[in-house]
Every structure is written in C-alpha cells, then in structure tokens.
C-alpha cells in the first residue's frame, strides 16, 4: 500500500469514526472466510460497519474522534465494528456471534463517547434494541387510552347487565 492509499484509508476511517455512536474493538483470531463473510453480512444488514484494520492506520485515523481513547487497544489482529444509529444492535450481534466462537474476543468499546470494557458490551447486548424500545414505548402510550376506554364503557355494561337481569326476573314472576 503506497502513501496515497494509506492517506485515503486514514481519511475514510477518520470520517467513519467521527460519525460512530458505537465503536467496538475486537480480536478476530482463527476465523475462516465463510464465518467472517456471514458476520459481515449480518452487520451490513443492520447498517453496521465491520473492518479489519491495520493498527497504525486506525490509530492515526482515531485522532480527534470519539474513538481516540481506545486507540491504544489497536494491537495484534484488530476488527473495528462501528454503528452510526443504534448502540445496542452491534453488541447484540457480536454477543450472539461469540456464543459459538471462543476465538473472537471483544477488547473494548466506545459507546456514545464512554469507554466500555468487554463485560460492559455483554451487558449492553442484554438490553432491548432500539426497535424493541420503540415498541414498548408505543405500548405504554397506548395503554392509558385503552384503560380509559374500558373504564368509560364499564358502567354502561354493568347497567345493561342489571337491567337484563331485572327483565329476566320480572318475566319469571310473570
């Protein structure tokens, strides 16, 4: 790779690192091409970048970005996973991926400007994602309206039952 290509890679990585809400630094050892391709596809479908990076280029690209505090963890084989919207989805996808693979290790992460260790990423993976949270919030907003409709309708239903029971009682009496 010549100097121009390196500068281009640094510029591209810097731009992505600056936009990232979550950046996870991982160590992808002993993974075959098919497994990595499958992981890349899952991450790409979720609009998450997965890059195997040259450590010196990544460290230079990290300068002046939210990823800079973890640049010292760019040692050995390094994969960089970056998300620009949702911070939970990359953690969930990587935690799911790691269940079957001991070789893939999360070193550290930056989540919305905060340094998080591997345990923190695992804990984040257990939280509901953005879509699930939106669904829960919508259900919570709709719930009071549903309860109110039931409460408003209940007295009328009870009155109708009382009138119906009294009507049946009078018919039996004759």
Curated annotation (Swiss-Prot):
Question: Which superkingdom, per the lineage?
Answer: Bacteria
Q: Cross-referenced InterPro entries, in alphabetical order? A: Ribosomal_uL10 (IPR001790), Ribosomal_uL10-like_sf (IPR043141), Ribosomal_uL10_bac (IPR022973), Ribosomal_uL10_bac_type (IPR047865)
**A Pfam short name:** Ribosomal_L10
What processes does the entry annotate via GO biological process terms? Answer: translation
What's a Gene Ontology MF term here?
A: large ribosomal subunit rRNA binding
Q: What Gene Ontology cellular component terms go with this record?
A: ribonucleoprotein complex; ribosome
The alphabetical list of record keywords is: Ribonucleoprotein, Ribosomal protein, RNA-binding, rRNA-binding
Q: What does this protein do?
A: Forms part of the ribosomal stalk, playing a central role in the interaction of the ribosome with GTP-bound translation factors.
Q: Summarize the subunit comment.
A: Part of the ribosomal stalk of the 50S ribosomal subunit. The N-terminus interacts with L11 and the large rRNA to form the base of the stalk. The C-terminus forms an elongated spine to which L12 dimers bind in a sequential fashion forming a multimeric L10(L12)X complex.
Report the sequence similarity comment from the record. Belongs to the universal ribosomal protein uL10 family.
Question: What protein does this entry describe?
Answer: Large ribosomal subunit protein uL10
Native source species: Anaeromyxobacter dehalogenans (strain 2CP-C)
Q: Which gene encodes it?
A: rplJ
């Amino acid at each position: 790779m010549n100097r121009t290509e390196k500068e281009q890679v640094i510029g591209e990585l810097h731009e992505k690192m600056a936009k990232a809400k979550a950046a996870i630094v991982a160590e992808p050892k002993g993974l075959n091409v098919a497994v990595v391709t499958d992981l890349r596809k899952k991450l790409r479908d979720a609009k998450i970048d997965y890059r195997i990076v040259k450590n010196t280029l990544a460290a230079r690209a990290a300068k002046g970005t939210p990823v800079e505090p973890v640049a010292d963890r760019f040692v050995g084989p390094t994969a960089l996973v970056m998300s620009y919207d949702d911070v939970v989805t990359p953690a969930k996808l990587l935690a799911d991926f790691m269940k079957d693979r001991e070789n893939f290790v999360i070193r550290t992460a930056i989540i919305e400007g905060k340094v998080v260790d591997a345990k923190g990423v695992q804990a984040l993976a257990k939280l509901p994602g953005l879509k699930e949270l939106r669904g829960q919030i919508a259900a919570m907003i709709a719930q009071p309206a549903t309860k109110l409709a039931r409460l408003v309708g209940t007295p009328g239903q009870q009155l109708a039952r009382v009138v119906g029971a009294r009507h049946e009682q009078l018919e039996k009496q004759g």
